[in-house]
Amino acid sequence: MLVLVMVVLFTLVLLFVFYIGNFVLSCKDFYKNKISSFECGFVSIGKIQNSFSIHFFIMMLMFVIFDLEVVMFLGILVSDLNSLISFFMLLMFIFGGFYMEWWYGKLVWLI
């Protein structure tokens, strides 16, 4: 138990030393370009500082939703034969959502 406490304390001290060292040794140029976020090639300096592309947001949302649905597929595939109906309902939901996004033109990449 004492060894575990010593390891945790050593890790916290080392983390604190690295944090303070980074703060002391870092470059202190506070220009407007330095402190603004880089948004995948978009210039975010102007009247609106929170500019972002809605297409990036939609693609991220699609990735999260379809990634979660793949995880649900894995759970359904290892269960019994009675879950075949729920598997096809989930598959129909995925294809329906994908078709709806294609129909509304949200899959067209515009910058």
UniProtKB/Swiss-Prot annotation:
Per the record, the domain of life is: Eukaryota
- What InterPro entries does the annotation carry? NADH_UbQ/plastoQ_OxRdtase_su3 (IPR000440), NDAH_ubi_oxred_su3_sf (IPR038430)
What molecular function terms (GO) are annotated for this protein? NADH dehydrogenase (ubiquinone) activity
Query: What is the protein's species of origin?
Result: Ascaris suum (Pig roundworm)
UniProt-listed Enzyme Commission number(s): 7.1.1.2
Q: Which family does it belong to?
A: Belongs to the complex I subunit 3 family.
Task: List the keywords (alphabetical).
Answer: Electron transport, Membrane, Mitochondrion, NAD, Respiratory chain, Translocase, Transmembrane, Transmembrane helix, Transport, Ubiquinone
Q: What protein name is recorded for this chain?
A: NADH-ubiquinone oxidoreductase chain 3
Q: Which GO terms describe its cellular component?
A: mitochondrial membrane; NADH dehydrogenase complex
Against Gene3D superfamilies, the record matches this protein to: NADH:ubiquinone/plastoquinone oxidoreductase, chain 3
UniProt gene name: ND3
Protein's membrane topology: Multi-pass membrane protein
